[in-house]
Amino acid sequence: MNLVRTAMLLAFMTALFMFVGFLIGGRAGMMIAFVIAAGMNFFSYWNSDRMVLSAYRAQQVDERNAPEFFAIVRDLARNAGLPMPKVYLYDSPQPNAFATGRNPENAAVAASTGLLQALSPEEVAGVMAHELAHIQNRDTLTMTITATLAGAISMLGNFAFFFGGNRENNNNPLGFVGVLVAMIVAPLAAMLVQMAISRTREYSADRRGAEICGNPLWLASALGKIARGAAHVPNEDAERNPATAHMFIINPLSGERMDNLFSTHPNTENRIAALQDMAQGGMNVSTPPVRAANPSRKSRSVPDTGLGRGGSQPPKGPWS
């Protein structure tokens, strides 16, 4: 089913790219757009995960420089029956996390330094279990390709004026009106695609993540903290790359952005309520619960990776 969904997504994005090309340059523009879209589809399948990780300057960590964080992900992956993903940290005060990769064998999970500072180990386990659920459900390919192509489509729409704004351009069948339509429709359509693939996907990952970590309340508590943090702490890299917003566990964009009129995520309170109902109703756990390291302690520092505060001071707390 995921292969069909991904194929439909690629077909829609390609058609949208061709439509914008037609509005800008007529048939010639449409054919050029088709060639570009085909190349981007191929490139994004193999490289979009690296592009996303690079956009957030994420650094890979292991048991040497982030032993307890790495151990939590390792134990959760074992519970889920997944291959061990690559583990990354990116430097941002906003608590958040995402997963990427074209399949479970080539997957990665990334957490912000702010996440490790703000959440308890149990809550971190809930968050990473949610991200592993995306990997297990094979959502990451769809998420990552959408981020890459949506960003490209939005950029093409934003620069449509420069490519096709010449009123005397005979290749443009609709003239300046066509350019204006491309500038408005392309980013909006890309945004709607992100919305369409995010809603049910997040609920499904919440439920499976709760099963993987063994306690829905860990994830419920984490979602509340992350949502409050995202509302007050900006993520500058996400603001520069809004097409990646749907990849995060909570929308990283500030409330001041117009993009939030078309939220890429379901309401956080509804997600928390669903997890609480799951806990109260007696969760059918299919895997043994993970035991979070130092469960009574809150994170006060980040691993010694050179990110955040961990590079200059000896690390303290559960992530050292």
Swiss-Prot record:
Listed cofactors: Zn(2+)
Keywords linked to the UniProt accession: Cell inner membrane, Cell membrane, Hydrolase, Membrane, Metal-binding, Metalloprotease, Protease, Transmembrane, Transmembrane helix, Zinc
One term under GO cellular component: plasma membrane
GO terms of biological process kind: proteolysis
Cofactor note: Binds 1 zinc ion per subunit.
Annotated compartments: Cell inner membrane
Catalytic activity, EC: 3.4.24.-
Membrane topology designation: Multi-pass membrane protein
Active site: E131
Domain of life from the UniProt record: Bacteria
Gene Ontology MF terms: metalloendopeptidase activity; zinc ion binding
Region (Disordered) residue spans: 281-320
Principal location class: membrane
Cross-referenced Pfam families: Peptidase_M48
Segments passing through the bilayer: 6-26, 28-48, 145-165, 173-193
Binding site for Zn(2+): H130, H134, E202
Similarity section: Belongs to the peptidase M48B family.
Name of the protein in question: Protease HtpX homolog
Originating organism: Rhizobium leguminosarum bv. trifolii (strain WSM2304)
Gene: htpX
